[in-house]
């Protein structure tokens, strides 16, 4: 996962979906009301392409929670590669990424406003991502 997203993604369900689909990569996807690049998906949830989101677009985005087969590391040639670009786009071209759609809570924390929103949810005991017992 990326370090800037908070979610109640069911990791076990994501992993089980990955095991069943037989692809090299499975990414979680969410449909937020915001400003992210969009995933173009087939009817079977295969990732076909990545594109920048327009003001009128409301597509699925990469939620950052992924299951990857070790072979995916072969797509990373050196430490200058942006993982979201070359490796993931190549996997999509090869039909090797599936998407697991998450309809639960997801929130990025890219801005101070995002941070304050998440802190308010936490401090008022309304944090949907807190799925464990104290």
Regions found by a protein language model. Name each.
Residues 21-31:
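A short, conserved acidic/glycine-rich loop-to-beta-strand motif
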Residues 6, 11, 15-19, 32-34, ...:
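Catalytic-core segments of class I nucleotidyltransferases/pyrophosphorylases
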Residues 1-3:
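Active-site acidic Asp-centered loop
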Residues 42:
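Extended acidic/charged loop-beta regions that coordinate divalent cations
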């Amino acid at each position: 996962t990326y370090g800037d997203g908070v979610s109640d993604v069911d990791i076990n369900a994501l992993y089980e979906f990955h095991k069943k689909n037989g692809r090299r990569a499975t990414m979680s996807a969410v449909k937020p009301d915001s400003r992210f690049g969009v995933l173009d998906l087939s009817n079977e949830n295969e990732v076909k392409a990545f594109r920048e989101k327009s003001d009128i677009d409301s597509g699925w985005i990469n939620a950052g929670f992924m299951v990857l087969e070790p072979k995916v590391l072969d797509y990373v040639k050196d430490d200058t590669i942006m993982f979201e670009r070359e490796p993931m786009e190549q996997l999509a071209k090869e039909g090797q990424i599936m998407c697991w759609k998450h309809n639960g809570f997801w929130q990025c924390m890219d801005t101070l406003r995002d941070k304050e929103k998440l802190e308010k949810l936490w401090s008022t005991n309304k944090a949907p991502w807190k799925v464990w017992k104290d």
